[in-house]
Amino acid sequence: MSSKKRTKRNRAGDEYKEHKGRSHPRRKFLPPEEPDVSRISKVAGVNQLEELCDSFDQPLHSTAVDACGEEHSENESSGYVPAPQRTNAERSEKMLLETPEGDVHEFSQSGSVREPLMENLNAPNTTRSEVKKKRPSKKSSSDSSVNSPSSVQLWCPNKLKRSSRDITELDVVLAEFEKIAANYRQSIESKACRKAVSAFCSAFEDQVTDLITEVQELKNTKKKNAKVVADIKKKRQRLMQVREKLSRTEPQLIKLQKEYAEVEERRSSLRQVVQFLTDLKELQQDYLDYREENPRKKVVYGASSLPALLVESRRILQAERHFQNINRKLEYALEVQRGKLAKEH
């Protein structure tokens, strides 16, 4: 059983590689010994569906091939595709794209438009030309749906704050991947395939969301770094200006400090003089009060009174000198007057 399963999986992988190498769905060319394409319309509907399903690519998904490779190989070896499986394959290969104007276009996953089965069998050439004509409409509609702000969902975690300006390619990829994965998951009937697809989708979404978070954190860090650099630059310029101003005002500061020291010294000396004068005035008032109370007592001068005696002696000496000067002037005036009188007589 294991060898049969391995051969079936290898056969399914080879067929998947052959279908993956094709960029657009082609028509099969039959060998000369097989019947012509024009005879296909006469065959039963089951054989027509088999030929049509073989002409389209398999879904390009690794999990779908690995998990469902056994079923694909069994169906291909038997040469018959059941109806539910055909409808699911057709449903998985279709994708709806809605433009901002409200038009809805239906495309297959391989990039071609699904035409009705009978038209595909009866007129294959016309179908191919219609596919080529309708292909630009898919690009324009997909571009408009991606570029339109309403079609892109912004993934915003709880820790980070994001705005419409922070939309990146990863957000677009994540939104489109979720849509495609949801459509593809609905088209699968097997539970194992659904689990595999869900696991792959969750892992891919986790990786993309981690990348989005890291990119947003990097942007925020760059913004903060730019702000810090700008603040440092401003503060550095301010520091240079302050240094220049300090160098210019330093001589003035030294001069003002000297003047302040002189003013403080004068102020302190003035305080001392005022205090000394107030004390001397109080002492003199006390002495006068004492002399009024005791007028008969002699004044006794002690060692502490020497400064006062010196001041008093200086005052007395000055008065004596003043009187001597007056006496000399009077004597000189008398002598002059006597000389004049003598000359007259």
Curated annotation (Swiss-Prot):
Instruction: Give the Basic and acidic residues compositional bias ranges.
Output: 88-106
Location of motif Nuclear localization signal in this chain is 222-239
**KW Coiled coil (keyword) present:** yes
Q: Which InterPro entries match?
A: CENP-U
Q: Does the keyword Disulfide bond apply?
A: no
Q: Indicate what this protein is called per its UniProt record.
A: Centromere protein U
Coiled-coil boundaries: 201-294
Main localization (coarse):
nucleus
**What gene is this protein translated from?**
CENPU
An example Pfam family from this entry, by short name, is: CENP-U
Q: Where in the cell is it found?
A: Nucleus; Chromosome, Centromere
Segments of skewed composition (Basic residues): 1-10, 19-29
- Biased-composition ranges, Low complexity, are 142-152
Which residue ranges are recorded for the region named Disordered?
1-37, 64-153
One GO location term (cellular component): chromosome, centromeric region
Q: Report the function annotation for this chain.
A: Probable component of a centromeric complex involved in assembly of kinetochore proteins, mitotic progression and chromosome segregation. Required for maintenance of sister chromatid adhesion during mitotic checkpoint activation.
Q: How does it assemble?
A: Interacts with CENPH-CENPI complex at the kinetochore.
Q: Which UniProt key words apply to this protein?
A: Centromere, Chromosome, Coiled coil, Nucleus
- Originating species: Gallus gallus (Chicken)
- Return the similarity comment: Belongs to the CENP-U/AME1 family.
